[in-house]
Curated annotation (Swiss-Prot):
The gene is aroE. This is Shikimate dehydrogenase (NADP(+)). Disulfide bonds: none annotated. CDD domains: NAD_bind_Shikimate_DH. Homodimer.
Length: 269
């Protein structure tokens, strides 16, 4: 009996990940069976965990917090998106045995904001909260939409300034933020611990969309705060998750899934 194609998501923590359910839905659309698991790699042992996975028959992998920049360093070659971001969320095993790193986070985010949340990015003022691999991954695709400006703010100011310099955007200390943003995107992971970024509530006064890149309960603290502070519309990152997963699946298998029924399926769980 032929072994099923095997995929996985690497992270720490990763037990909460919905990626296995999402990719099973994609496989049903394609009419195939696959294996898709969760691998919690120890901090400091990510490279070894990836090597073991691909060395024992793995076909492709997703990478989540906190390993996206390590995945970039590990990949033998990179897509333009990944090179621009300096972060990788998708590893593809090539026929020559090398690993290609790609980044589909930005595709998932922009696709959800524009197509599902019906909010244009072009010509808008955008605030990004956080400066980690997740945020780096979405900036190139956001810039390609021609926003009026992108501002980045982070708890550690130097990290925000480093990212801003890399992409030619603005960095502002969190405490100095004021209104004027159409779209505010939270890319910090504090919601996993029930925390929100240390930001003034009045930045949401003219905000058309407050978006958290995480999903479910972890997004609730930020989105509740945004709503109470005046944001007109809020959304968690479920659509982004499904969208980036669909782009990864297409890179691995050459089949492009329809994300809308999968988003509805995940909401119903």
């Amino acid at each position: 009996m032929t072994a099923l194609p095997r995929y996985a998501v690497f992270g720490n923590p990763v037990a909460h990940s919905k990626s296995p359910q999402i990719h099973r839905q994609f496989a049903l659309q394609e009419g195939v069976e696959i294996e898709y698991g969760r691998i919690c790699a120890d901090i400091g042992s990510f490279a070894q965990a990836v090597s073991t996975f691909f060395g024992t028959g793995g076909c492709g992998a997703n990478v989540t917090v906190p390993f996206k920049q390590e995945a970039f360093d590990l990949a033998d070659e990179h897509s333009e998106r990944a090179s621009a971001a300096g972060a990788v969320n998708t590893l593809i095993l090539l026929e020559n045995g090398k690993l290609r790193g790609d980044n589909t986070d930005g595709l998932g985010l922009v696709g959800d904001i524009v197509k599902v949340q019906n909010t244009e990015v072009e010509g808008k003022n955008i605030l990004l909260l956080g400066a980690g691999g997740a945020v780096r991954g979405v900036i190139p695709v956001l810039l390609a939409q021609n926003p009026a400006r992108i501002v980045i703010a982070n708890r550690t100011r130097a990290k925000a300034e480093e990212v801003a310099a890399r992409f030619g955007i603005e960095a502002v200390p969190m405490a100095d933020l004021n209104g004027g943003f159409d779209i505010i995107i939270n890319g910090t992971s504090g919601g996993l611990n029930g925390q929100i970024p240390d930001i003034p509530p009045d930045i949401f006064q003219n905000c058309a969309l407050a978006y958290d890149m995480v999903y479910g309960e972890a997004a609730k603290p930020f989105l509740d705060f945004a709503r109470q502070s005046g944001a007109k519309q809020t959304a968690d990152g479920l659509g982004m998750l499904v969208g980036q997963a669909a782009a990864s699946y297409a890179l691995w298998r050459g089949f492009k899934p329809d994300i809308r029924p999968v988003i509805e399926y995940m909401k119903a769980l």
